[in-house]
Amino acid sequence: LQFAAMDGLLPLAEHMDYRVARTYIIDKAEQRKLKMPEALRRWALTDEERNIRINYIKPFMIPQEGRDILELNLDYVSKIADDVQARGYKLGPAGVFSKNTTDGKFAPYFPERAWLVPLAFAILAGGIMYLTLLFNFSKKIQYMLLLTGGIVASVTLLKFGGILTRQLLALIAATVFPVLSMTVIVELWESCKKNTPNTLKIIISATWQLALAVILSLIGASFVAAVLGDSRFFLEIDIYKGVKLTFILPVLLISLWYMQRFNVLSKGQIGNIAVHLKNFFSTRITVKHVAFLGVLAFVAYIFVGRSGHTAGVPVPALEIKMRLFLEQMMYARPREKEFMIGHPAFYLAA
């Protein structure tokens, strides 16, 4: 699902005191490429997954399936209504986000700015924990960094509302806490290195380790939800910025930590991350390095291009069919990168 800016959208929402509902529309240019059954499946699924309350349906302007335009569009709208109601929704006036009030009247939800201050300190503490793993900061430096960063964040949040600050804090939480989670897991693997011939024991061990990694990562997810929790973000007038960075940064951050922790490319030297990076950039490049980087660049292109709020790498037809199968077979379709690549790789590493 992509996001398109609309002229006048923000002033209109503010003028309405955020008494507005989320709307979904299939882009006109995209709809020209779709057959009716393919467009049909999007509506109810999007309503459920994206909390949509208004479906803005544009008619097909070219006959399909041997039917004229009127018959095609009447059937199209009728089936959309049936699919939406089959998922438990009711047709009628759209509901809007509102906080509970004593008089029962509508009011947009905006938390007290002071509540964001402890969140900012907690998120920054996670970032400083990671930096300490790389640079071995003393307790004094850690406290100084936390105090300085916390004061700056608090001032922007309390005085200006700090939308950009909140988005930056959310980015830190979304990238750093999964990395901290994996550092715990890798240290756990290092502490219990032994040959376990029993396949069942390996699977059980890897399963609870994966569960631990998920739980630790959910700490960061909880911070993201808390720091971006208000009507503007619920309605996606403001959105989480940095989706592609959220894919790239954890890989880079865990790689830097791994180089530091296991003295990769250190040539026998025990030093901080600066030593490892200096040795890395002094490495002599060979043809096999270029070939490896080419493969890595292609993988990165697919990995990053398939993320974000905007169009990127096209999805193959086979994968679209697999998605449809998973949507029908499971309550919620899992992310392919997770259950086809990430989770199997975790079990192999464990």
Language model region names:
Residues 1-113:
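Soluble extramembrane regions of membrane proteins in the secretory/endomembrane system
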